Amino acid sequence: MKAPSMVTNDTTSELHEHRSRLLQAMAGVSASKGVAAATIADIVREAGVSKRTFYEHFDCKETCFLALYRLTSASALRTLREAVQPDRPWQTQVEHALDAYFAHLAAGPGLVGTLFVEIHHLGSEGLRVRREVMAQFADFVLETVNGGPDSGGVPLSQVLTPTMALAAVGGINELVMLAIERGEVDRLQELTPCASAVVRLLTRADAA
């Protein structure tokens, strides 16, 4: 006979709420003082929970930050996917999706600056997660370009290669970093034409 679960719907809801509050607190604390200077005491105080609750969800502050990074990256990727218009030429799809992406980032300038900068300070694990997220974005670009109705008669698998898709994401990422350094996150949508051109230029020349 199967033993009854000790996790009720109420318990699950409470755990979800605590995790959400901890992630929000991590965002605020890391934005104000950086991950290196942040302490678990800072995070739980901001979240209004105990240290015990923190350790029920995360091993350390770095794990908490990486969870925040993954969560916000997934939200940004969802914005990109929702902006795709499959019946339009891929060039139009890319431009529309990137404009929505930049608008999404510009809506939270403090968080964007924290995530894009602080991830570089988390050593090999931070690098691994960053590459994981960049690969997901590259897959999106690859699918959008190669799945679009206008590929110039070139076999879809040859319009944009995985390597060039990753290069496009890397280039766009650097444009965002530059905007952060200049304090121009609120103007990110102005990068849409340039970022779209990066993707177009990295497709095969005979697919133009």
Q: Where is each model-derived feature located?
A:
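Helix-turn-helix
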Residues: R21, V29-T63
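N-terminal intrinsically disordered/low-complexity leader segments
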Residues: M1-E17, G152-L156, A207-A208
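Amphipathic alpha-helical segments that line or abut small-molecule/effector binding pockets
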Residues: Q24, Q91-A106, L166, G170, ...
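Generic hydrophobic, amphipathic alpha-helix propensity
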Residues: L15-M26, I43, L68-A76
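Amphipathic alpha-helical packing segments from all-alpha helical-bundle domains
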Residues: A74, S124-D150, Q158-E174, Q189, ...
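C-terminal peripheral helix-coil segments that are non-catalytic and often amphipathic
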Residues: M1-V7, A103, A107, D139, ...
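Hydrophobic alpha-helical connector segments
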Residues: A67, R81-G110, S157
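Amphipathic alpha-helical segments used for helix-helix packing
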Residues: A106-E125, L142-V145, M177
